[in-house]
Amino acid sequence: VIVGGVPGDIETALWRSGDVILGSMLALLFCSIYPQRAYTHWRLQMHDSLQQAGRLYHTHLSPNILERPRLAQSHARLLTKIVSLRPLLAPAVKETRLNSTLFEAVQTTMRNTFCTLEMLANTYWRDRQSHFLMQSHPGLRACQQATEAVIIQLALMLKSGDSSAAEAIARLQAAAAEVQAEVRPGADDEATISGYLWLNLQLTEQIAHLHRLLGLVMNPPRSQGNKSS
């Protein structure tokens, strides 16, 4: 490739050698300036997944929709995407030197959260009577809005490191506790929403746990950072 087909053409060979060396140096330079970071890519993909989950949750619970939206395939694609991110965990662990079980816990908690969101949608649209009952309950509506706000804040946390999700989670926990105090499982008019309330409480715990895990991934303890250095 360097010498070419013409014998004795030293000048052309030198020019081609210089081109190869210059191209190699430029490639190394750009690789050092724009590295392929699995950790950053993983965070951005998880951010996109949370945003998509928030949109699905909002669509399912929108008071402007009279019939259940057909989003089963969207939920399935969302769960598939979370599983497809697993190959990024090993290189992300090498880049951050964090414990691999931490990344595994984030993935598992995220998947469980998405499954709970899907179960909430199924319960919300199970039958027309209970649907309108849950839709007209002010406490549940406040809990739903607080859940949407937390999902948005967690997505922002993954993208930019914003730490304001703690306030949104506190509001969600307060809203869930208020609804739990209002609903009496033995009452006939509230029995239909007791299962939905239980799922909301489970979701609140999962979201709070996910927030703690993301805090460790985004801002690891100093002792762990010193060990990695």
Tell me the role of every PLM-derived stretch.
Residues 88-96, 103, 107, 177-187:
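Short amphipathic alpha-helical segments and their helix-coil junctions
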Residues 1-98, 212, 216-229:
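A transmembrane helix-and-boundary motif of multi-pass membrane transporters/channels
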Residues 109-229:
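Soluble C-terminal extramembrane regulatory/interaction domains of multi-pass membrane proteins
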Residues 11-15, 36-50, 68-79, 100-113, ...:
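Amphipathic, non-membrane alpha-helical segments in soluble helical-bundle scaffolds
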